[in-house]
Amino acid sequence: RDPEMSRGLGDVYKRQEYPHAGYGGMFRRWLHAENPKPYGSFGNGSAMRVSAAGWLFDTLDKTLEMAKMTAEVTHNHPEGIKGAQATAAAIFLARTGHSKPEIKRYVEQTFGYDLNRTCDEIRPTYHHVETCQETVPEAIIAFLESVSFEDALRNAVSLGGDSDTLACITGGIAEAFYGMPQELRDETLKRLPEDIREGYELFRWNIGQR
């Protein structure tokens, strides 16, 4: 666990710039703790927030290492770490020119997720669930079935359940694979507060300097 990362997360929250951003109860308690420690979560938040790790590093091994680090600050259950690593690995493979069959095979063999279902098979019985093991595979399947960035997001949202998290995970992989249409990028950026836009621009600059 990286204490600097823990403090950084806590400091951002305690500035109270976004008090209604939908933090979970366990996360709120973690942030207010005097000495915050991981709380054994296998929730899908670790996968939802990991996409940057898939972009910033030059090797898959380093990507997996950093995905683990970002997860275990809070989500140190093996399933929480696995969900973050699978998502980051899929993004890394997508942005480095690997095909969908290659991405699917790697995720299945490395993390043991079942990616042989279809969105049509998932929808009838899917429900709101916030675990990595019942969110990350479905999000990856939504990407695998897609034909474009927007189609991937539509697939993810169409599953129901924790749709914003599904779309976040799917969208991270889809952008790495397809790119993001400029009109969607522009519209999204217009809706963000200035400080978050500045963070985005710094992130894009860092990617360009790799």
Regions inferred by a protein language model and the residue ranges of each:
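Single conserved hydrophobic/aromatic residue that forms the stacking wall/gate
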Residues: 1-13
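Short, well-structured alpha-helical segments that form the helix of a local strand-helix-strand
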Residues: 11-16, 63-68, 100-113, 151-157
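Active-site flanking loop/helix segments enriched in acidic
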Residues: 28-42, 48, 71-72, 118-130
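Active-site nucleophile and cofactor-binding loops and adjacent substrate-binding regions
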Residues: 38-45, 80, 131-132, 160-163
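Phosphate/ribose-phosphate-bearing ligand recognition and processing surfaces
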Residues: 40-42, 60, 64-83
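Catalytic phosphate/nucleotide-handling subdomain of diverse soluble enzymes
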Residues: 59, 67-73, 86-89, 139-209
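A cyclin-like helical interaction fold
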Residues: 83-148, 152, 199-210
